[in-house]
Amino acid sequence: MATVFRPLERLRVPRPSLHPGVTGSGSACCRCTLGAKRYLLTDNIVKLKEFQHKKIAIAYNLPGTKEIYFRNLEEKLTQNKLILKEELKTLLYLCQSLEDVQLAKAVIYRYHAENKNFTLGEYKFGPVFMRLCYELDLEDSAVELVRDKHLQGFFLDSTSFNILMDMLFTKGKYERALQVLIEMKNQDVRFSKETYILAFAICYKLNTLESLKICTTLREEALIKGDIICRRAYCFVVALALNKNQLKNAVSIFSQIVNPESIVCINLNILIHIQSNMLESLLKILEDSLDTNLSKFVRRHTFSEEVLAKVREKLKDSPALIARFDEVYGKLHVNGQITVHSLDALLCHVPRDKRSNLLLLKKRAVSHRTLQPLSRSLLTE
């Protein structure tokens, strides 16, 4: 390709704009009313509950006390003795405070210095440490370690960086989250599907032309690498492009979304029509969503009250069009096709993890009543 890409590490970390266009009120995801504690990663990635359950189990089965265990490790450090893998693993699960984490950091440095040349196939401590920091709200400690040159190679997996970026995103620390993303790229850690979601969400929250350029760079590099960018990630870029009045860019990205039938895509499409001045087509979309021939089991399109307010504002100078809109709006309201959630809240809401249902199905192989194996036909039903 003839296009020259700017390396991501050379891009300046942009300061977030205080007046995003799409979100209206500019409400942050941590004020989202959808009831989720995290707003980007699903439970099967963060695994916080699983981590906490394991902490309880390890503490219960520990021979002796936590204080004795910690004292033995401190002696090993002062006597320059070898740190074993199981010792570090147990230590991470026993930590309950910032003081405990300080000891864990010292042990991590020693362990990595002793084992950095033997990382292939080794146990990944990075995600465990990040879950510990997530639980204790110690994002500063996590950022310090991932950016420390002496620990290069310790955080080799995308999950560690993803959990840290999610932690920073949830707390509204978007600039620091972008710095972690840049560090991840500089360390040549392979991006996962979740990484692209986080990266584009961070750029969307920064809400600057510079952050939009970062999205463009990442999309082009993903194309070269053959990485797949999911619909949810693309939606953040479309919203950002619309915020910055980059309509052509927004339309181009939206056209790449496969099956744009989600509630977020439906509302982004309405905003694209508003900025394109395609008012007749816009009203046709709203009217078609009222199709009375649809089965009650088919999910109808749902529109954000915030987005519909923008439609009304756009149509206010045309009495004929505003009359049509008011009629459609009333019917949408009666049908329950209007949500009070803003587009920002819808973008940041974590979709339900489908894999958890599959795991339950796999686990349920024996009848609770007869204690006999369930038949294949029953499982398929």
UniProtKB/Swiss-Prot annotation:
Record has Transferase as a keyword: no
Q: In which tissues is this gene expressed? A: High expression in heart and liver and low expression in kidney, brain and testis.
Its primary localisation, in coarse terms, equals: mitochondrion
Indicate yes or no for the key word Phosphoprotein.
Answer: yes
Q: Which residues carry this modification: Phosphoserine?
A: 375
Where's it found, cell-wise? Mitochondrion
> By its UniProt entry, which InterPro entries does this protein fall under?
mS27/PTCD2, Pentatricopeptide_rpt, PTCD2, TPR-like_helical_dom_sf
A biological process (GO) of this protein is: muscle cell development
Pfam families, from UniProt? MRP-S27
Q: Which parts are the PPR repeats?
A: 159-193
Keywords for the protein's UniProt record, in alphabetical order? Mitochondrion, mRNA processing, Phosphoprotein
What is seen without this gene?
Deficient mice shown deficiency of the third complex of the respiratory chain that caused profound ultrastructural changes in the heart. The outer layers of ventricular cardiomyocytes appeared to be infiltrated with macrovesicular fat deposits, having the appearance of adipocytes.
State the GO CC annotations.
mitochondrion
Q: Which domain of life is it from?
A: Eukaryota
The entry sums up its family as follows: Belongs to the PTCD2 family.
Role this protein plays: Involved in mitochondrial RNA maturation and mitochondrial respiratory chain function.
The entry's protein name is Pentatricopeptide repeat-containing protein 2, mitochondrial
Species name: Mus musculus
Please name the taxonomic classification of the source.
Eukaryota, Metazoa, Chordata, Craniata, Vertebrata
